[in-house]
Amino acid sequence: YISGQYVATTEEEANEVYDRFGVYAIHAGRGDRLGGGDAESLDYFPREKADFADNKMPNPCYAIYLTCDPAVLADIDKYIEYAKTTKINAFVVNIMDGTSIGYNSPVYEEYSPTAYQYANNTVEEYRQVIQKIKDAGFYAIGRLTVFNDSFFCQDHPEYAIADQYGEPLMVANASYWPSAFCRYVWEYKVALAIDAVETMGFNEIQFDYVRFPDRTDKYEEAGTIDFRNEYGETKAQAIQRFLMYATDILHEYGVYVGADVFGEASSNYVTAYGQYWPAVSNVVDVISGMPYPDHFARNGTYRPWEHPYETLLDWTESAAKRQSETPSPAIDRTWIQAYNAIQPPYNEYGVQEIGDEIRGLREQGFTGGFMAWNASCSLTKLEELRPLYEALED
């Protein structure tokens, strides 16, 4: 599943090609602290990033997020008219978000009939939305969740993360996860991405939930979880190798590939769920951290979500260090919190707070843009943020 172009035939050749920039010394001391694997066993082969003449990525890229709910997509003309009057230049639209299915792709018929049955839109309904976005001159990013897929596990329990008896195990967020070690799952998600590119015309595929489930340590310690690790890989190896496989294939279709990672991935260790920033950034075209201030733990009386500028400033300092630890880093384009805090005192996030997040990113050198996460896709909220989005830097 990995291209032969990355294979060296001798140790001397491997050392010359793979460690040209001395990057392995950086990662050598980062062992397997949390069960996700060690950093040294991952791949840092310098990769030439894609730059398609007929598919130019906005720089910076400022995107708003849309679900695939029919009620949201019915308002696509309103979202487009709004974006035309601001500096917004891109849309992120769900192809698949767990059990929320964008359209009835024939790929589902083959791999996951249950997903096909529950599609929110027909192919033509969904295509009209993406075509309107592109016809209006906006960059179209298709968001596709990978290893959080209860429908697929229902159809293929043999590929699901299982309990000690071989039955699918409900894990994070009360959902079922196919194993990231299973190549059939890789094939399925890449086939779905290809269909979205060919049928809908997306400029970029963004993989989310490209990780193992978090908070599985209690099962691992008790020996009551089976990840179906057929090839004896670490979690981080499986995640990076999936991204290598997917990126190489999707580049053949002239589209960029992005990956979302938890905010924790900016730390200098391999996370328990297999995300390691330098290894992901080295492979994909765009890396998107998710440092939502209300997802950070409080420190005594200090609530990070009440200090969005300082929180993003500190986080980006760490993420920038990880970017420097790989020979071919991806473009940084960060998910920012564009919704009111979900922790007490439930701070409102408006022009000031979201502007502070953006300022924290830029002051640490993250200038690739942002994507504003608001799961409600509220037009009223967008109007409140108009002064901010009108004044964004070119």
Identify the meaning behind each predicted range.
Residues 75-101, 197-207, 283-288, 361-370:
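Catalytic domains of carbohydrate-active enzymes, especially glycoside hydrolases
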Residues 86-121, 214-222, 382, 389:
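Aromatic-lined carbohydrate-binding/catalytic grooves of carbohydrate-active enzymes
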Residues 52-71, 128-131, 142, 147-195, ...:
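Active-site-adjacent "subsite" loops/lids of carbohydrate-active enzymes
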Residues 103-114, 149-172, 210-229:
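Aromatic- and acidic-residue-enriched segments that line the glycan-binding/catalytic groove
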Residues 284-298, 307-313, 318-394:
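Substrate-binding cleft of secreted/luminal carbohydrate-active enzymes
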Residues 1-47, 387-391:
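Boundary regions of SH3-family modules and the immediately adjacent low-complexity/disordered segments
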Residues 62-71, 108-123, 172-187, 228-237, ...:
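The substrate-binding groove and active-site-proximal loops of carbohydrate-active enzymes
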Residues 139-149, 206-213, 233-273, 327-341, ...:
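Aromatic-lined carbohydrate-recognition surfaces of secreted/lumenal glycan-active proteins
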